[in-house]
Amino acid sequence: MLRLVGYDARSQILEVVFNTGGTYQYKEVPASEYERLMSSESIGQYMHRHIIDRYDYERIN
């Protein structure tokens, strides 16, 4: 599902590249949320349950 995940703590932007090729930036994601994402058993499931429908986002490609 996910190819790459990056996070900028200063701007609180979570950037995700999906296997389908789409790159999305999720806005105002707290560092604690990013930490939970990265330590979760399944990053894909965590994205669906806690991030995708809860944070504003923009597709950048």
Predicted regions and their residues:
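Acidic/histidine-enriched, beta-strand-rich ligand/metal-binding domains
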Residues: 1-61
